[in-house]
A protein has these predicted regions:
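A short, conserved structural fragment
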Residues: 377-388
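Short amphipathic alpha-helical interaction segments
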Residues: 365-379
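C-terminal scaffold of the Radical SAM
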Residues: 15-30, 50-83, 89-365
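Minor-groove-contacting beta-hairpin "wing" of winged helix-turn-helix DNA-binding domains
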Residues: 388-394
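Short, amphipathic alpha-helical interaction segments positioned at domain boundaries
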Residues: 395-410
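Local cysteine-cluster metal-coordination motifs and their immediate loop/turn environment
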Residues: 35-50
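Flexible, acidic/Gly-rich N-terminal and inter-domain linker regions that tether
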Residues: 1-33, 40
Length: 410
C-alpha cells in the first residue's frame, strides 16, 4: 500500500501561503504536476499512492471514483489560481502522472490541461507530458491527446523480457512499448520517453542488454533507467521474504548501470541526471528539471506534493478524502513545511549534484568542502569542473551518488 505522508504543520483550510513564498515569484519557473491515482491492477513492486477499483470499493463512494476525477482535479487548479493570486507566470511545464493517467478518457486529460491554460496560461514552448501504460493507449487515444495540447509522452516499458515483466506484475506484452513509440510519433508527439527498470529478480545481464536494445531500437529521444527498489509492504517484498524470488544485490545494480550508460552513450544518448539520458538538450524532461533545480510547482491530486517559494506541502492521500475537501471548499492539503535557508541549501546539493553540471563548490559548508576534496581524490568528482568551482560526479561517482551527497551535506 502507499507509504505514509511526512510530518509537518497543518495546512490552512484556504490553502493560503505566507507572503514570502510569493515574493519574487515572477523570477521562477512554474510547473504543474497532476496526479491520477488509479490503476487497473497493482504492480508488485509499487508503493506509489495509487488505487485499484477493488481497493477503493466502499472507501469513498462516488467521490473516490475515477469517473468524476477530472472535475475534482480541476477544482484544485482553480484553488491554485486563488492561492497564487495575480501571479503573472505562464505555466512552463505540466506533467500528468500516476497511477495510470491513461485509464481516464483522453478527453478528461485534455480538460485538465485546458483548465490550467484557462486559469494561468501556458508558455509558448510549454512542455506537456503524460505518463502512459503501453496497454492503455491506442492510436486514436494518442491522437486525441496530441490534438488537445500534449507534446510529450512517457511509456512504462520496464523490460523487453516476458519473465521480467511477470515478476514486476506488468500486464503489457514485449514489443508493445516499442509499438507505442511509433504510434506516438505518428500522432505528432515531439518527445517520447521510455522508462526502464534494472535489477529485477531473475533478470540477467543479457536480459538487460536486450531491454536496452529494444528501447533504443524504438527511437525515443529520452530514456530513464532506474534500479529496482524493493519497498517494505509491497507484494514483491513479501515474495522475496518468503524465498519465492531472489533479492538482487547492489553489485548487480552497479553492473547494470554501467551497461546502460555504455550502451546509451554508443547510441548517442547523454546522461543529464543520474537516471536519465537524452539525445539532445531539447529531449530532456524540463518538468523534472524544475524539481531538481528548486523551481516552483503545484502538485494537484491525492497525495501530490507542491513547492512554492520555500514552502512545501502535500495533499491528503485518499481520493475520497481529497474530493470531499474540495467539495466543501477546503484545501486538500494535509500538511506543510516552511524551509529555512539552510534547508534549501542542503536540498539544492541533494538534488543538483545528481545533474550533469553538478553544484557550485560555494554551496558547500567547510566540512562538505573537505569531503569534496576527498571525493575528488577518490575519483568520484571530475577534476576539470572542480578546478572551475563545481562538484560534478564522474561515472564512478554516479554509482555512489547517494553516499557522495551524504558526505557533502554533512
Amino acid at each position: 500500500m502507499p507509504s505514509a505522508l511526512p510530518d509537518g504543520e497543518p495546512m490552512p483550510e484556504d490553502g493560503s501561503l505566507p507572503s514570502h513564498a510569493l515574493a519574487g515569484a515572477g523570477d521562477r519557473p512554474l510547473g504543474f504536476y497532476l496526479h491520477v491515482p488509479y490503476c487497473a491492477t497493482r504492480c508488485g513492486y509499487c508503493d506509489f499512492n495509487t488505487y485499484t477499483a477493488t481497493e477503493l470499493r466502499g472507501t469513498g463512494g462516488v467521490l473516490a471514483s475515477r469517473e468524476n476525477y477530472a472535475d475534482t482535479l480541476i477544482d484544485e487548479v482553480r484553488l491554485a489560481r486563488k492561492v497564487l493570486g495575480d501571479d503573472p507566470r505562464a505555466v512552463r511545464t505540466v506533467f500528468v502522472g500516476g497511477g495510470t493517467p491513461t485509464l481516464l478518457p483522453a478527453a478528461d486529460l485534455v480538460r485538465m490541461l485546458a483548465a490550467i491554460r484557462d486559469e494561468f496560461g501556458l508558455a509558448e514552448d510549454a512542455e506537456i507530458t503524460t505518463e502512459a501504460n503501453p496497454e492503455s493507449v491506442d492510436p486514436q487515444y494518442l491522437a486525441e491527446l496530441r490534438a488537445g495540447g500534449f507534446n510529450r509522452i512517457s511509456f512504462g516499458m520496464q523490460s523487453a523480457k516476458q519473465h521480467v515483466l511477470k515478476v514486476l506484475d506488468r500486464t503489457h506484452t514485449p514489443g508493445r512499448p516499442e509499438a507505442c513509440v511509433a504510434e506516438a510519433r505518428a500522432a505528432g508527439f515531439e518527445h517520447v520517453n521510455l522508462d526502464l527498470i534494472y535489477g529485477t529478480p531473475g533478470e540477467s545481464d543479457d536480459d538487460w542488454r536486450a531491454s536496452l536494445a529494444a528501447a533504443l531500437g524504438a527511437g525515443p529521444d529520452h530514456i530513464s533507467a532506474y534500479a529496482l527498489i524493493v519497498e517494505e509492504g509491497t507484494q514483491l517484498a513479501r515474495r522475496i521474504r518468503r524465498g519465492e524470488v531472489p533479492m538482487t544485490d547492489d553489485d548487480v545494480h552497479a553492473d547494470r548501470y554501467l551497461i546502460a550508460d555504455s550502451v546509451m552513450a554508443e547510441a548517442g544518448y547523454s546522461w543529464y541526471e543520474v537516471s536519465n539520458w537524452a539525445t539532445s538538450e531539447a529531449g530532456r524532461c524540463l518538468h523534472n528539471e524544475l524539481y531538481w533545480r528548486g523551481a516552483d510547482w503545484w502538485g494537484a491530486g491525492p497525495g501530490a506534493h507542491s513547492h512554492v517559494g520555500g514552502v512545501r506541502w502535500w495533499n491528503v492521500k485518499h481520493p475520497g478524502a481529497y474530493a470531499a475537501a474540495l467539495a466543501e471548499g477546503r484545501s486538500p492539503g494535509a500538511g506543510r513545511e516552511l524551509l529555512s535557508a539552510e534547508d534549501r541549501r542542503v536540498e539544492r546539493i541533494l538534488l543538483e549534484l545528481r545533474l550533469v553540471d553538478g553544484v557550485p563548490l560555494s554551496l558547500l559548508a567547510p566540512a562538505g568542502l573537505a569531503a569534496s576534496r576527498k571525493a575528488l581524490a577518490d575519483g568520484l568528482l571530475a577534476p576539470g569542473p572542480y578546478e572551475a568551482g563545481r562538484a560534478v560526479l564522474t561515472l564512478r561517482g554516479r554509482l555512489l551518488a547517494d553516499a557522495v551527497v551524504r558526505d557533502l551535506v554533512d
